[in-house]
Amino acid sequence: MKINKKAALHNLGCKVNAYETEAMKQILENAGYEIVPFTEYADVYVVNTCSVTNMADRKSRQMLHKAKKMNPDAIVVGAGCYVQTKEAEALLDDTVDIVIGNNKKHELLAMLEAYENDHGKYGNVIDINHEKQEYEEMFLERTAEHTRAFIKVQDGCNQFCSYCIIPFARGRVRSRNSEDVIREVKRLAEHGFREIVLTGIHLSSYGVDTGDNLLHLIREVHNVDGIERIRLGSLEPRIVTDGFAAALAGLPKICPHFHLSLQSGCDATLQRMNRRYDTREYEEGCQILRKYFDHPAITTDVIVGFPGETEEEFAVTKEYLERIHFYEMHIFQYSKREGTKAAVMEHQVPEPVKKERSNILLALEKKMSEEFREYYVGKQVTALMEEAYEFEGETYFTGYTKEYVKIAVKSAADLSNQFVKGTIRGRLTDDIYLMVEF
């Protein structure tokens, strides 16, 4: 039924948030709303907020205020992590009409209808940390991506790293029923998607609350016809055992592209962060992956300037990163997050020092990434093509190998969602390699 109303959504934050934003978009579409870009006039604006840093809180507030400025008469909905952790602040904000916390996003339509009936400010934020919660099922019938679909299979985190607010924003681990996951994967395969990415707030914890486990879920997804590639979201190092890696290596659809969260290469820093592994365990995980997969892509996250990080500790981290030799590293300068233990730790590192250390590791990341990709020059690979790319007056199509190396094929034809085999001949741009078909 067409209701002659327009809705616009804006996502802030992680892949899980992006999945939930897409699900809310489909809820509104199915109810008859016309979805328009967030920069356009709309009757309803939904901002799925983020709270991972104080800056994320600020950006969330800015986007909510921007929505109200675009149409003062619009219903502005604040959803997600910022309003979950700052409920009172959000409820006092005159620009926000409806506040929806985590695990309640599926009630968006009902909240809109209730607001329109009596025009009173609505808040629906549960105490996500002290009530036993079930997984919030939000089903995607389609996705804005063209070849690769992200599937949320887990929510919540039980780790409580000293710098992180997410366990308080997302609550305890909640795993999605595997049957619901497979039903969604099959639907996406029917719509032509050939690559699936399993994602969650703490993916490695999948099944700890239900008696299931991540490996079993991966095997189930692997059995779905039409899906030809499976990628995994961020993994905890301790999940990587010989048994786990050997099982993955026996599944041909698995992409040898693994994101193992590290944060620091110094054990003393890891202890202050309350990370539940040491550098020896982490390195063993990388060695295991390299034993079962040929030249796997291993990527990671690193925080520089964590409270108490001395020059000596940073030097230890840098040497460790060089030894592991990652494909890609996401480098973050430590940012105080109100409400975390790290925010009140002594020996906070000055901002100029954080920036200097970040620049050092960014240069190292660039060098290691180039070395990893250069390995494939002269080798035959298969890439799943995604989109057209214009370069120096020529038309190419770009895509990714299983290891997530971006390549380009010279072609005026539409190659999207097709597998193309060829030999990598060299570099087209700084981060795109040229592949010749055969």
Regions found by a protein language model. Give the residues of each.
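Conserved strand-turn element in the central/C-terminal portion of the radical SAM core barrel
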Residues: 160, 164-171, 230-238, 264-275, ...
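Hydrophobic, well-ordered secondary-structure elements that form the walls
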Residues: 260, 301, 321, 329, ...
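Short, surface-exposed connector motifs at secondary-structure boundaries
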Residues: 6, 71, 224-231
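Short, small-residue-enriched loops and turns at beta-alpha junctions
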Residues: 54-55, 203-207, 238-239, 305-308
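Proteins enriched for Cys/Gly/acidic motifs involved in redox and nucleic-acid/cofactor modification
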Residues: 1-205, 219, 243, 248, ...
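Terminal RNA-binding accessory module
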Residues: 344-438
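Contiguous mid-protein beta-loop-alpha structural module that forms a pocket-lining wall or clamp
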Residues: 309, 324-326
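Radical SAM/AdoMet-radical enzyme domain recognition
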Residues: 190, 215-216, 223-229, 241-300
